[in-house]
């Protein structure tokens, strides 16, 4: 009897049956955007729900310690529930919390960062209440994305469609009117789809690997107004056409290419039209070979410094960036200005400091820092991004930023490990050597997995006065902050930034001060 009771407690799913109807209240949101509700202590994950909803669900999957439910109906809506602006929000799944008021979205994201710092980082609630600042939100939390990638397919009637993949599937939800993208996206897509229909241009079919048009990439410079369109194509479908894979071939890459170009050029702001060659059976969108069909190879955009103490008003200081179809560039330029201006403010630069910028991408933060630092060293693993960073520095007349290609966890320890040899090398000044091996500030902006352990260890050995951590994942942020604090640093300021309204994602900027071991 006792063993039966123990087994039953261990397997709480035994209290439920698949397809059983249950009621619950949503008490939290998961990292994937699913609502979390408990029934007799057993948690269910339920899509399309928000905190505060009283819902009826159907149990669709039962695991040992948690299950998944499908929303059947909202019994009592949350006071934070609003009518979503997009009619595709449930099918698409890209905007997991669009049914939540924007004010509550910001509160949710603040709590998400705080809870991870509490639970994973082990920081005290009183400390966090003292150092955490309000989430930086958007005045207009729609139409903020400067980049969109639309898969192209065929509907049941054989007509070309563009849209987005339904959650966790490869089924395209036809939608040319995503409310996160710019207004021009719809006009561009409709022109391409009409061209495909009129000239019987095939869409790529993943199962067979046949078909020509795979994706459409659209980028827009918010300050310049310049628009780039890149069609990702599968030219193996056009076997027999000589020269189809010749670099810079003057042959047409698309049937009736001239007609498509004429339609796209008529759209205001059109600056660049190109194709990306991707013949692989892969879910990677872009190919590595780009051919410009019309206009420039790149578009430009300018990121301005903002005054964080004056409601984030623009200061007039800006950095211009050159953007190719393959460039990494933050997709929300309005919030990017606020995010990087916070990082610049937290760095506390006076013009005399040396700074390392780790995971620097195309140099966005590095070039922001260069205007107020003596020297900036940027590190990025993607060689093309480093080439872009160097070119962006040259385009802006910046001479005090130096960039290195490689993994931060290899480049930084490599430099530090060779400090004695470099210190005695000809041509290196004492001030330059000191700044490189003992910087005043280190800025890190790692991917979701956070900083590598070797990188963190070297940062602690370098012992900069300040570390500014820009994070896109508050769980790995909390883990890394604990390591740095155990190594002699103290949290000074934490501020979340809403880079992706209508989604569960949140970025953060953190200032740490060295206080000794």
Identify the function of each model-found stretch.
Residues 2-88, 410:
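Terminal RNA-binding accessory module
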Residues 35-40, 163-166, 230-232, 389:
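Short, acidic/hydrophobic/Gly-rich beta-strand patch recurrent on exposed beta strands
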Residues 37, 52, 95, 216, ...:
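Residue-level signal for inorganic ion chemistry
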Residues 52, 181, 332:
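Short, conserved phosphate/pyrophosphate- and ester-handling motifs at nucleotide-, phospho-/glycolipid
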Residues 72-83, 90-205, 223:
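Extended interfacial segments that mediate partner engagement and assembly in macromolecular machines
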Residues 172-214, 235-274:
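Internal alpha/beta scaffold segment
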Residues 219-221:
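Structural signature of eukaryotic scaffold interfaces centered on beta-propeller domains
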């Amino acid at each position: 009897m006792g063993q039966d009771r123990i087994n039953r407690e261990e397997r709480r799913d035994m209290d439920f049956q698949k397809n059983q109807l249950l009621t619950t209240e949503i008490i939290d949101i998961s990292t994937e955007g699913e609502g979390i509700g408990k029934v007799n202590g057993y948690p269910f994950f339920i899509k399309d729900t928000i905190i505060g909803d009283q819902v009826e669900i159907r149990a669709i999957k039962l695991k040992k310690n948690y299950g998944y439910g499908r929303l059947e109906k909202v019994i009592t809506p949350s006071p934070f529930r609003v009518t979503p602006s997009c009619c595709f929000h449930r099918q698409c799944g890209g905007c997991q919390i669009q049914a939540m008021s924007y004010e509550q979205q910001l509160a949710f994201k603040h709590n998400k960062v705080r809870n991870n710092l509490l639970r994973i980082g082990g920081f005290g609630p009183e400390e966090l209440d003292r150092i955490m600042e309000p989430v930086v939100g958007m005045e207009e939390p729609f139409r903020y994305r400067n980049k969109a990638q639309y898969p192209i397919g065929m509907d049941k009637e054989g007509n070309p469609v563009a849209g987005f993949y339904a959650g966790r599937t490869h089924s395209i939800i036809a939608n040319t009117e995503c409310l996160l993208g710019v207004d021009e996206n719809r006009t561009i897509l409709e022109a391409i789809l009409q061209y495909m229909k009129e000239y019987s241009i095939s869409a790529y079919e993943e199962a067979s690997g046949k078909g020509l048009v795979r994706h459409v990439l659209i980028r827009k410079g918010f300050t310049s107004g310049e628009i780039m369109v890149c069609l990702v194509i599968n030219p193996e479908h056009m076997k027999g056409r000589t020269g189809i894979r010749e670099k810079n071939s003057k042959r047409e890459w698309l049937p009736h290419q001239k007609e498509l170009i004429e339609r796209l050029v008529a759209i205001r702001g059109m600056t660049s039209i190109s194709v990306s060659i991707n013949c692989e059976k892969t879910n990677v969108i872009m190919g590595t070979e780009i051919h410009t069909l019309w206009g420039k190879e790149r578009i430009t955009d300018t990121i301005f410094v903002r005054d964080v103490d004056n409601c984030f008003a623009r200061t007039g200081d800006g950095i211009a960036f050159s953007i190719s179809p393959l460039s990494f560039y933050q997709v929300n330029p309005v919030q990017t200005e606020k995010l990087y201006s916070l990082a610049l403010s937290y760095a506390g630069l006076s013009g005399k400091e040396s700074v390392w910028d780790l995971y620097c991408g195309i140099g966005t933060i590095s070039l922001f820092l260069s205007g107020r630092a003596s020297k900036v060293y940027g590190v990025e693993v993607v060689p093309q991004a480093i080439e872009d960073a160097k070119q962006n520095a040259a385009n802006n007349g910046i001479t005090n930023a130096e960039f290195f290609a490689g993994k931060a966890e290899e480049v930084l320890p490599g430099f530090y490990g060779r400090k004695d040899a470099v210190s005695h090398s000809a041509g290196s000044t004492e001030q330059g050597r000191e700044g490189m091996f003992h910087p005043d500030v280190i800025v890190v902006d790692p991917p979701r997995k956070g900083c590598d352990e070797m990188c963190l260890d070297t940062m602690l050995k370098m012992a900069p006065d300040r570390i500014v951590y820009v994070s896109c994942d508050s769980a790995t942020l909390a883990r890394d902050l604990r390591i740095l604090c155990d190594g002699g640093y103290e949290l000074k300021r934490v501020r979340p930034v809403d880079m992706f309204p209508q989604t569960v994602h949140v970025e953060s900027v953190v200032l740490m001060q060295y206080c000794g071991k």
